[in-house]
Curated annotation (Swiss-Prot):
This is Serine/threonine-protein kinase RIO3. Pfam families: RIO1. Its main location: cytoplasm. Keywords: Antiviral defense, ATP-binding, Cytoplasm, Immunity, Innate immunity, Kinase, Magnesium, Metal-binding, Nucleotide-binding, Phosphoprotein, Ribosome biogenesis, Serine/threonine-protein kinase, Transferase. The keyword Metal-binding applies. It is found in: Cytoplasm. Involved in regulation of type I interferon (IFN)-dependent immune response which plays a critical role in the innate immune response against DNA and RNA viruses. May act as an adapter protein essential for the recruitment of TBK1 to IRF3. Phosphorylates IFIH1 within the C-terminal region interfering with IFIH1 filament assembly on long dsRNA and resulting in attenuated IFIH1-signaling. Can inhibit CASP10 isoform 7-mediated activation of the NF-kappaB signaling pathway. May play a role in the biogenesis of the 40S ribosomal subunit. InterPro entries: Kinase-like_dom_sf (IPR011009), RIO-type_Ser/Thr_kinase (IPR051272), RIO_dom (IPR018934), RIO_kinase (IPR000687), RIO_kinase_CS (IPR018935), Ser/Thr_kinase_Rio3 (IPR017406). The keyword Kinase applies. Residues 122-159 are annotated as: Disordered. The active site is at D406.
Length: 519
């Protein structure tokens, strides 16, 4: 095979500086290439492509009914969809404005549907001019007009058209505009479209009434916060009970077990009281929490039980009525301590925290012991309960120097075959100005209950009074009997006023549990 050679270019005319000199350097000789080598390389490349095609066959995708294309531009469709969505949102906002206008009507207080709008206000700036902008408040009829200022000279106009700052029309309109400054809850009416003018006398009376109503509502709100509901507690009491549980003194409070006129009783499981010493005070497994109600409705007519008690007479004050509730709780604590020392079956006091008294629970497994009014006893058990009650009354009068003052079948419990006395917050000493009257009332309640229960040995109210008090008052009827009791009370009161009597030192003698006051 012939070799193909590339001919070198023919030399040009000789340069002026020499026939054999080239200003672009000496040209290199080209390498000769055989035609057979070029054809061999091309054949090898074709064979390699055939082998690759056989090893990796081309995958064909079947054409579907959908439209396909390689160079389809979708940017214009996206813009068109956004424009259509914008128009839909504007139509929705226009409908929302109409609904808002219909919903508010002519009301002075308007409800805004702004949170339900689709289009942002700046996106809706190219709306038509004839469409009313819902946020335009330049001509808002609900906004009071700005009053015309009065110059320093005190009048406006000249000649007959002079208007001073004391003009009746100007002052009336200013007073009408000032009604907007009243409290939100005060109804001032709707004066849109009306030229209302209030005189100074009417405006001042209305202003004073608005302030009075605001103060009255504040007092009612404060009273509601400090009051105690029928079966609930106020926030302060709830916080005190929470602190008892949080400190570990009580494990948990299960619920309400009794509700009275002066207090609410809750059941709780006891824990332990840490007093900073090596040994901690043991609290009963089950406790009763007596919460004295902080409302004074039931205590207003019962102050005679505590204001004439010599133990609390010096501390009683009508100027601090809320502290009377604490004195009731403290009084019951000291009375229970006296009874406990005398061996009378009664709850054991654990702790006194302001108006909350924690005691031992009389019952079992959250079930309180039944009252004598509720329990069904046999004739022998009823007779035994009567003699126990008689002994408890004598023991309470002689050893504890107390009169229950509210003893009845509702304040006596039957538990483990014994009569238990509860609710002694109103108990007083026999030297109380009405102590003997309270004792006679207790004797009447006890005598009537056991006589109705079929106890033949039950004494009458007058015989029971003499048996408990040790007095031998002889009278044919009840009126004379009460007259002699009042005479004895009067004699005792005169003796006290003449000779004086010191308050009982119960703080040293009773040895009760700690009294906690958190001011």
């Amino acid at each position: 095979m012939d070799l193909v050679r590339v001919a070198s270019p023919e030399p040009g005319p000789a340069a002026a500086w020499g026939p054999n000199k080239c200003p672009w350097a000496t040209p290199q000789n080209t390498i000769s290439c055989s035609l057979s080598d070029v054809m061999s390389e091309q054949l090898a490349k074709e064979l390699q492509l055939e082998e690759e095609a056989a090893a990796f066959p081309e995958v064909t995708v079947a054409e579907g009914p959908f439209i396909t294309g390689e160079n389809i531009d979708t940017s214009s469709d996206l813009m068109l969809a956004q424009m259509l969505q914008m128009e839909f949102d504007r139509e929705y906002d226009a409908q929302l404005r109409r609904e808002e206008k219909k919903f508010n009507g002519d009301s002075k207080v308007c409800i805004s549907f702004e949170n339900y709008r689709k289009v942002h206000p700046y996106e809706d700036s190219d709306s038509s001019e004839d469409e009313v902008d819902w946020q335009d408040t330049r001509d808002d009829p609900y906004r009071p007009a700005k009053p015309i200022p009065t110059p320093k000279k005190g009048f406006i106009g000249k000649g007959k058209d002079i208007t001073t700052k004391h003009d009746e029309v100007v002052c009336g309109r200013k007073n009408t505009a000032r009604m907007e400054n009243f409290a939100p809850g005060f109804q001032v009416g709707d004066g849109i479209g009306m030229d209302l003018k209030l005189s100074n006398h009417v405006f001042n009376a209305l202003k004073q009434h608005a302030y009075s109503e605001e103060r009255r509502s504040a007092r009612l709100h404060e009273k509601k916060e400090h009051s105690t509901a029928e079966k609930a507690v106020d926030p302060k009491t709830r916080l005190l009970m929470y602190k008892m549980v949080n400190s570990g003194m009580l494990e948990t409070i299960t619920g309400c077990i009794s509700t009275g006129k002066e207090s609410v009783v809750f059941h709780a499981y006891g824990g332990s009281m840490e007093d900073g010493k090596e040994d901690s005070k043991v609290i009963p497994t089950e406790c009763a929490i007596k919460v004295f109600k902080t409302t004074l409705n039931e205590f207003k007519n019962r102050d005679k039980y505590i204001k004439d008690d010599f133990r609390f007479k010096d501390r009683f004050s009508k100027l601090n009525p809320r502290k009377i509730i604490r004195m009731w709780a403290e009084k019951e604590m000291h009375n229970l301590t006296r009874m406990q020392r005398a061996g009378i079956p009664c709850p054991t006091v654990v702790l006194l925290k302001k108006h909350i008294l924690v005691m031992s629970f009389i019952g079992h497994d959250q079930v309180p012991a039944p009252k004598l009014k509720e329990v069904k006893l046999s004739s022998e058990e009823m007779k035994d309960a009567y003699y126990q009650t008689l002994h408890l009354m004598q023991q309470l009068y002689d050893e504890c120097t107390l009169v229950h003052a509210d003893l009845s079948e509702y304040n006596m419990l039957w538990h483990a075959g014994k009569v238990w006395l509860i609710d002694v917050s109103q108990s007083v000493e026999p030297t109380h100005p009405h102590g003997l009257e309270f004792l006679f009332r207790d004797c009447r309640n006890v005598s009537q209950f056991f006589q109705k229960g079929g106890v033949k040995e039950a004494l009458g109210e007058r015989e029971l009074f003499n048996a408990v008090s040790g007095l031998n008052i002889s009278a044919d009827n009840e009126a004379d009997f009460l007259a002699e009791i009042e005479a004895l009370e009067k004699m005792n009161e005169d003796h006290v006023q003449k000779n004086g009597r010191k308050a009982a030192s119960f703080l040293k003698d009773d040895g009760g549990p700690p009294i906690l006051y958190d001011e």
